[in-house]
Amino acid sequence: VIIRSAAEVEADSRTSSQNKTWKFKIKNTRDFAWASSSSFILDAAQINLPSGKKSLAISAYPVESDGQHAWARSTEYTKASIEHYSQQWSEYPYPTAINVAGNEGGMEYPGIVFCHMNSKGEGLWGVTDHEFGHIWFPMIVGSNERVHGWMDEGFNTFINDISTKNFNQGEYFRAQSLQRM
């Protein structure tokens, strides 16, 4: 579901002259991050967790990153990644899973990840899945990634391979496997 379309971003109009106050809260975390921009398209979809609980996949990206082979699929990737890891390992603990297009290669925080705004297709799937995989390793298991980096990246890369094989009937798995040869 598109919450804020490219047309609304480009119109640069406000529906109200009054200020709004947004309050953010996240429980059981050791870190946090947030992002905002009047240039973001906002897209969202329901995440179905194994227990029957729901979460919300949200993507925030600029008009320049839009496109069916680019960030227009970010919410699909986020939803698939969270649902897979929740089914395979442990249920996702946060009410939202947000993927923000930024200028970094990829960075994870509880409930939110940042992926490069120019990522597309297999690259966007890979970085999205990898950064959300960090919710499980190291965040949920509680390991110290600065002391045990091999656990952080090693376990995460392992679960990423399984997730990529399962995503959309292996849409990106074959391409990824061929690149390793």
What residues fall within each predicted segment?
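Hydrophobic helix-coil surface modules that form long, contiguous segments used
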Residues: V1-D129, F158
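Residue-level recognition of alpha-helix boundary/capping or hinge positions
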Residues: T15-N19, Q176-M181
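Zinc-dependent metallopeptidase catalytic helix centered on the HExxH motif
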Residues: A72, F114-Q179
